[in-house]
Amino acid sequence: MSNFSIISDYKPAGDQPKAIDEIIKGLNNKKRSQMLLGITGSGKTFTMANIIERTNRPTLIMAHNKTLAAQIYSEMKSIFPKNAVEYFVSYYDYYQPEAYIPKTDVFIEKDSSINEQIDLMRHSATRSLLERRDVIVVSSVSCIYGLGSPDLYYQMTVNLEPGKSYPRDKLLNDLVNLQYERNDIGFERGCFRVKGDNVDVFPSHYSDKAWRLSFFGNELEYIHEFDPLTGEKLVKLDKAIIYGNSHFVMPKETVNKAISEIEEELQKRIAFLKSQDKLLETQRINQRTQYDLEMLTETGSCKGVENYSRFFTGRKAGEPPPTLFEYLPKDALLFVDESHVSVPQIRAMYNGDRARKEVLVEHGFRLPSALDNRPLKFEEWDNFRPQTVFVSATPSLFELNETGGEVVELIIRPTGLLDPECIIKPATNQVEDLVGEIQSTIAKGFCVLVTTLTKKMAEDLTNYLQELKYKTSYLHSNVHTLERIEILRDLRQGTIDILVGINLLREGLDIPECGLVAILDADKEGFLRSEVSLIQTIGRAARNSEGRVILYADKMTKSIDKAISETMRRRTIQQEHNEKYGIIPKTINRTIHALAELEKVDSKLDKKQTHNLFENPAKLKAHIDKLRKEMLKAASNLEFEQAAKLRDQLKTLEEAALELS
């Protein structure tokens, strides 16, 4: 069994050793829930990594969006280069669920675009969980959505060992049942080809390696891993396990049984709708379901097959669907990062999905069983989750209730950096005062973050500062991901001095060059000026040894009082630690991972090409598809050097797209 092994120049420091020991003690004492209160810059990811290494347990890390998940994935991959660090998020680049609007009698068909790179990574994640124990899966909250049954997924594998006999026709038929496509010309992921005594398989979890099965009659002589572009043999394998090209692969008997049960439910539904005098709905559900049944009979699948998933997994009505949590070993460990955001997201997912599907069922577009194709209810997730460590600088009531109010604090930063000094100034004439503060901050070589309450105010302030010849940009929800990364890069490199926004709490906005955070209208109680929001915003200045925060307020609110009190408490703890050990706070430059990926692309493409390429996701996808075709064409023409260059460029773009998704 492989053990987790951290490869790093750093050792736990500050509060980290104590926090690691306390969390591990709680895990050993069978505590189901623990709270790691980690502030900005305290090394939460490195602390999690050390807990994983010492407990040596398979781990799932949940984040509340793809961007944060990608950031944690990149960091964990660099910390654990010898172990399986996997990425599991929604594989849709674009997703429009089917829906019906009764008021206007409009039915919207499901429309989606699947990201092949992320689909590959999802397969790699489930394969790792089934084959090894040194696994870390970093996931968004989409991991609570239905996935194929792990029992069926593993049952449908094809296990191969040299020296054993495998009737070739049966093997080819098994590959088709695993939803692999025979393609003797265009060999790509999810395909197989037959050449003489060789069967080449391109596994669903690889992008640059395939397997060559060499037969003598029905006897499997060798299994070689090879480069599908150049044909170069890389290594001889002792065995190979081929997993399905979809998480929803099913044996023929399961499909036939499901067809029978779907027909039975259809007849019950028709009888019910007729009893309600809903003739249009009766005709609609009969026509749509009969078409799906014909497709299932002929091909084993149909459009929207996931709506019949309950019949394929053998679950009863109302039972939770199989999810990634069922792939986890019983002794797995769960970290919920930024839990104050992630937990409410999990709680909200079921209700939104249910409301949309109930309308479809009511109006005859779907059978009632479609309601069981859903994310987990919050109570189900709470029941399924293994031993859990919630991680947040601002824990919410749920986490505190789960841990009985106990928290493990990660406050002392190894860098010695203090929480920023907080100053309250009158909101009257706040803009005039801000201009003076901006001038003095920029003079020191630092940049400024300004947060407002409304989009209109942010736009007006940006225009005003630009008129005063300050290099100012505006961050808002309409800014595409790549453009957002470019703005942050410009801010860090000094091309921009001031960034104005409404909600500057988004992850990845940790900027060591930030010398001032200005919070306008700080006394306007609400979501953007709550205690949690204020603490998170104040934290944006915590990576600079000279960082300051100015709160413009005409009155002291409870949120301001609590936020400043908590900030001062943390500042005092760090100060005492620094004095005791003679630590001098020092600003540490930190590379933004997505930024690094963007710079990788910039090094291979000129700036204009990069900007045009990433202007929108459709352009990026089209360019990646074009490069892939060029790569395959070069390989088929035996131009292997050119094909390898294109493959490297393609891989760089796909990694960048993943970071920027």
Swiss-Prot record:
Binding-site residues, ATP: 38-45
Helicase ATP-binding domain span: 25-182
GO cellular component terms attached to this protein's record: cytoplasm; excinuclease repair complex
Sorted UniProt keywords: ATP-binding, Cytoplasm, DNA damage, DNA excision, DNA repair, Excision nuclease, Helicase, Hydrolase, Nucleotide-binding, SOS response
Pfam families, per the entry: Helicase_C (PF00271), ResIII (PF04851), UVR (PF02151), UvrB (PF12344), UvrB_inter (PF17757)
Helicase C-terminal domain location: 430-592
Subcellular localization(s) per the UniProt record: Cytoplasm
Gene3D superfamilies to which the protein is assigned, alphabetical: P-loop containing nucleotide triphosphate hydrolases (3.40.50.300), UVR domain (4.10.860.10)
Motif stretch (Beta-hairpin): 91-114
Free-text note regarding domains: The beta-hairpin motif is involved in DNA binding.
Subunit structure: Forms a heterotetramer with UvrA during the search for lesions. Interacts with UvrC in an incision complex.
Protein name: UvrABC system protein B
Species name: Rickettsia bellii (strain OSU 85-389)
Gene name tied to this protein: uvrB
